[in-house]
A protein has these predicted regions:
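Conserved catalytic neighborhood of penicillin-recognizing serine enzymes
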Residues: 2-38, 114-132
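Penicillin-recognizing serine hydrolase domain
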Residues: 43-200
């Protein structure tokens, strides 16, 4: 299917396993992979989105409403506190945790191995050790990032939710500044500046 406002590295009309789609989703923020994964669930689009909203309610995400499975609709809404609840839930899911923190990987698509890098520069360049993280972007909300540090900072678990940034570099720098401010150790000390992440 064509999804307006995004592209994909994945080849068309190619069999891809659900595990490989999840990998593309969580490492590279591939919206086509998210859409294809929902299509493979054995239910209609409407039923799948209903399941997403039911899960959000189950997690206490009372300000969250999903309108599509790819994450690109401006009708999808949430709140910072709901993202905290989702991050806590995701931290108890080893596969989600592992994939979201993978620097780069190959996604098996038919006979091809498609190289994909993490869309989060803090993970890709190993600035911090993440427990869970996820980037996001649409025009209406700007560049966003949820990042929870793996190791305690001054005896506390520190997470940063960076919303409505003008660029991917800005969200990375804001998050890095907050993690440093609360005593989280930087794993690399080069001056990374404002260079851009891959979009999403």
């Amino acid at each position: 299917d064509y999804i307006k406002g995004t592209g994909t590295k994945l080849p068309k009309h190619t069999p891809i396993s659900c595990n490989e789609l999840l990998k593309a989703m969580l490492v590279h923020s591939d919206n086509y992979a998210a859409h294809a994964l929902s299509r493979s669930a054995g239910m209609s689009r409407t039923q799948f989105i209903q399941k997403m909203n039911q899960k959000a309610k189950q997690l206490g995400m009372n300000s969250t409403r999903f309108h599509d499975s790819s994450g690109l609709s401006s009708a999808n809404i949430s709140s910072a506190m709901d993202l905290v609840k989702l991050a806590k839930y995701s931290m108890n899911k080893p596969q989600i945790q592992m994939l979201s923190n993978t620097k780069a990987t190959y996604v098996r698509a038919g006979r091809q191995n498609v190289f994909m890098q993490n869309t989060n520069r803090l993970v890709r360049e190993e600035m911090f050790d993440a427990a869970i993280n996820k980037t996001g972007y649409i025009r209406e909300s700007g560049y966003n990032l949820v990042f929870v540090n793996k190791h305690q900072c001054n005896k506390a678990t520190i997470g940063v939710i960076s919303l409505n940034n003008a660029s991917s570099g800005a969200r990375s720098n804001f998050t890095r500044h907050k993690l440093e401010q609360y005593g989280c150790d930087v794993l690399a000390h080069e001056d990374y500046g404002l260079e851009e992440d891959e979009e999403s």
